[in-house]
Amino acid sequence: MEKISLITGATGHIGYALLKELVDSGEKVRILIRKDVPVFDGIDCEKVYGDVTDSESLDKAFEGVDVVYHLAGVIDINPGVEDLTWRVNVNGTKNVVRACQRCNVRRLVYASSVDAFPPLPDNQVMTELDHFSPKNLDGTYAKTKAIATQFVLDNVHEGNIDAVVVHPGACIGPYDFKVSNVGEMVRMFIKGSFPVSLSFGAYNFVDVRDVAKGMHAAAEKGKAG
């Protein structure tokens, strides 16, 4: 039987880049979407309709799937979306993990974020953590990603699931159809309407295609956790 990879969040910047990466590599890909959009026209992928906040819709979507790439999430940091952010980023991730267990998915690749890491003292190099907590994090997005990340890791440590967690930085590059926050910032900077300066530290940008290749490699070669 041909192996199937499923992507949640395929309409997002990283999700679409990952879809292109997997399809161009010859994989059979299924995408979980809430509604059809023209950007998928001409791409050889199977579309299933559902929502990560609806656990029942995931069982049908995950049936026969070998690898799930979970990228669906709310990144909006504006006020008024806190409840949606919690429902999608935390509850949605819990639903995905449990659906992977029920459907015997071989591996989950979860897209967390560098924002799940707490701020560090000056001149201290960031490294991997063995535990993620919302404590000392600013903003709903960062807190929800930390909580969801720890939920995935807890299930790995308990032997409930085989999963790899990745932490992308600020992605730039093609396929940013919905114009991400980072994409909009870069566009404004190029136009000269958004002067950028850093009083300390640095900001990490990464090509979205490199992130997609990294997630693909994580599915095939990554160590669980």
Regions found by a protein language model. Give the residues of each.
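Conserved catalytic-site region of short-chain dehydrogenase/reductase
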Residues: 77, 114-124, 171-175, 180
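Glycine-rich "substrate-gating" loop/helix at the edge of Rossmann-like oxidoreductase active sites
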Residues: 138-139, 169-178, 197-209
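NAD(P)H-binding glycine-rich loop region in Rossmannoid oxidoreductase-like domains
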Residues: 45-91, 99-102
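Conserved Rossmann-fold NAD(P)-dependent oxidoreductase catalytic core, especially the SDR/UDP-sugar
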Residues: 91-141
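Active-site Tyr-X1-5-Lys
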Residues: 137-164
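Alpha-helical substrate-binding/gating segment
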Residues: 186-196, 202-225
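Glycine/proline-rich active-site loop of Rossmann-fold NAD(P)-dependent oxidoreductases
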Residues: 159-161, 173-184, 217-225
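N-terminal Rossmann NAD(P)H-binding glycine-rich loop of SDR-like oxidoreductase domains
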Residues: 4-25
